[in-house]
Swiss-Prot record:
Homology family: Belongs to the Schlafen family.
Protein name (Swiss-Prot/TrEMBL): Schlafen family member 12-like
Membrane topology qualifier: Single-pass membrane protein
Keyword Membrane tagged: yes
Organism: Pongo abelii (Sumatran orangutan)
Gene: SLFN12L
Amino acid sequence: MQLSEGLAAHGTRRAGKWKRTQVPLLGEECADMDLARKEFLLGNGLAAGKMNISIDLDTNYAELVLNVGRVTLGENNRRKMKDSQLRKQQNENVSRAVCALLNSGGGFIKAEVENEDYSYKKDGIGLDLENSFSNMLPFVPNFLDFMQNGNYFHIFVKSWSLETSGPQIATLSSSLYKRDVTSAKVMNASAALEFLKDMEKTGGRAYLRPESPAKRACVDVQEESNMEALAADFFNRTELNYKEKLTFTESTHVEIKNFATEKLLQRITEILPQYVSAFANTDGGYLFVGLNEDKEIIGFKAEKSYLTKLEEVTKNSIGKLPVHHFCVEKGTINYLCKSLGVYDKGRLCGYVYALRVERFCCAVFAKKPDSWHVKDNRVKQLTEKEWIQFMVDSESVCEELPSPASTSSPVSQSCPLCEYINFKIQPLRYHLPGLSEKITFAPKTLCRNLFSQHEGLKQLICEEMGSVSKGSLIFSRSWSLDLGLQENHKVLCDALLISQDKPPVLYTFHMVQDEEFKGYSTQTAQTLKQKLAKIGGYTKKVCVMTKIFYLSPEGKTSCQYDLNSQVIYPESYYWTTAQTMKDLEKALSNILPKENQIFLFVCLFRFCLFVCLFVFFLR
């Protein structure tokens, strides 16, 4: 079965049955895993053992679930961890899992608590994890909810919100650097978005900066350009004197370092990506290695072969940096690397590593952006091209979950809603006798046909709606097909309930007694939730419950599965008000076929009319 992009789990149909399959991916070996709990391993090409993120299919939730393995939790416990690398790796795993879910329609993270006697209410999570969440999210409670369930810790993640004009994708690090006075700093998501949009608007920029107008001579005036000019003169010298004092200091265009010779190659390899990115994305600049904190020329001792190797390391490091072009020319990073000889009383005693980087026409990354999503049943890191496309083009975000071809709007956006309702919508309204008129059923023709053809269905619906004070029940021959998935022909029909004070419920009705429909129902509900956020534009927390009923030929009914009795969500996922009902119906109108879209326009119109009448009578 072919699935829409971005879904974590998929169902296969075998002899009419749906089963949630588990296929091992790249990463750690799956051979030793319990066959009942095989999971999708992270397929990002990183070394096995370092990454421990997997897609967990052994779950009752209609959610994308990422398992991050064993994690030490609690501020004191995490602070006392002896293995700092393990603490860092756990933080990265959890943070990347959060990022992937934010960018993939939401879900939750499952972590097995490493430390005994852990209590969320007493111990908290851990300051390093909290800081990672805060750095990624504008307001953590709007996106994350935390829950301990025995020895497991769950982090419920709402889909990244598209309600603002800010970044359209969650990011741990842009990997785009800039010079900030005397430092190379990574751009946060907002700064990166502004930088990229400026580049896109102008189609890149010239390699050479515009020449400054001539200035009158002012002896006492010192500017950034003075330090840059002195650094340029220093770079162009052929000989340097040992212990000579510099006449300039670090600035926007100058960075000074001093490393021990035995670690020189390693340290230069480590720092080059961020400093080259920063200089290239700003206005160019100079990196000098071999000067001490007192701005004295010290140099480092090296053979000629070592200097050659140093140039090769520089060339290879800069050549591997990811770049993205908005311009037509698509040039390369311009730089010049050399080793300046240091002399002590005429005797060569060492070298200073000198690197000049010209400003770049477009964007230079230090490495791939640290941003993740779930695609093709794998947790993947975005390439710089994908990330930029999502950042600057909000339409690209929706492409992760392709909308069915039938989801085009049935009416022009310029057509007044009331005019459209008067001519098209009134016949679709439908109410069942004995139930509150605040409960609406649709589409009218399909409802009547189903109730007349299948004895017991109407009575079952009346019983299920008995506790609903206000809501809409939207029937479909196949909600799975409406959402772009494969239809199960053994399903009689599906119905989605959107009601006040309860989460949405997806009902599945069938007449095949010995069949298993849990996988079908779960997959449909999960896809619906993801599309509500990524295509429909729904910005609040939401979960979709599932309920499966068997209808016998004699009209008898029985509930085969009720997700609400199997799972627990944070309280915030159960808050459904009149406003959230309206927002859900509006989001559904963006992803449904035309017939159901029309019904949702009815719901929106009735809600607006009700509010207007209420305000009128209050006056």
